[in-house]
């Protein structure tokens, strides 16, 4: 009996202590992509994580934004976290957003956003997805609802997330 218990504990420890060689991103979330599809623009050991909230940038890639401040390029999981950074009174330059069709970063000030679709948002109850082409934004809106807006209108909508935070 003693040998069986020791053997069982040893097997349990060996199985429980083995580590996977790679992280699996088998997410059914609309915002997610595979690590091979994601473009991470930050440098350093924490480049996979939102600079504001720490969320995984691959998992929330389709709502990812980036911007420059004092020669440092930051990447955010969402426009919510970009706005959170702006709330500190800093000036962010060259804002970019991921086009959910091409998965490439585009100029956020020229993007067509679909706000309030049936797809889940990131860091907000109101979803915000960006497109480089207005026709793509309209197709998405027709399938999933929402309204089309530009970057500045989306920033104003996002500011409401922080209304009760002070």
Regions flagged by a language model, labelled:
Residues 47:
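Residues immediately within or flanking Cys/His clusters that coordinate Zn2+
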Residues 18-20:
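Bacterial signal peptide processing site
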Residues 132-166:
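C-terminal partner/receptor-binding element of secreted or periplasmic proteins
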Residues 14-16:
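C-terminal motif of bacterial Sec signal peptides marking the signal peptidase cleavage site
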Residues 2-8:
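Sec-dependent signal peptide recognition
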Residues 58:
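Short functional micro-motifs and their immediate structural scaffolds
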Residues 71-82:
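Beta-edge loop/turn motif
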Residues 50-53:
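Short cysteine-rich clusters marking metal-coordination/redox-active sites
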């Amino acid at each position: 009996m003693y040998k069986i218990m020791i053997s069982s504990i040893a097997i349990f420890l060996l199985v429980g202590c083995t580590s996977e060689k790679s992280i699996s991103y088998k997410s059914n979330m609309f915002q997610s992509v595979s690590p091979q599809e994601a473009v991470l623009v930050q440098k350093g050991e924490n480049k996979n994580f939102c600079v504001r909230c720490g969320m995984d940038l691959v998992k929330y890639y389709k709502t990812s934004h980036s911007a420059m401040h004092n020669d440092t390029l930051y990447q955010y999981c969402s426009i919510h976290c970009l706005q959170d950074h702006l709330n500190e009174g800093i000036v962010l330059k060259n804002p970019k957003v991921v086009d959910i069709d091409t998965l490439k970063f585009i100029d956020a000030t020229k993007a067509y956003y679909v706000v309030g679709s049936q797809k889940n948002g990131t860091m907000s109850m109101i979803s915000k997805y960006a497109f480089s082409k207005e026709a793509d934004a309209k197709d998405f809106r027709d399938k999933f609802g929402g309204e089309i807006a530009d970057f500045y209108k989306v920033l104003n909508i996002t500011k409401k997330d922080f209304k009760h935070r002070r």
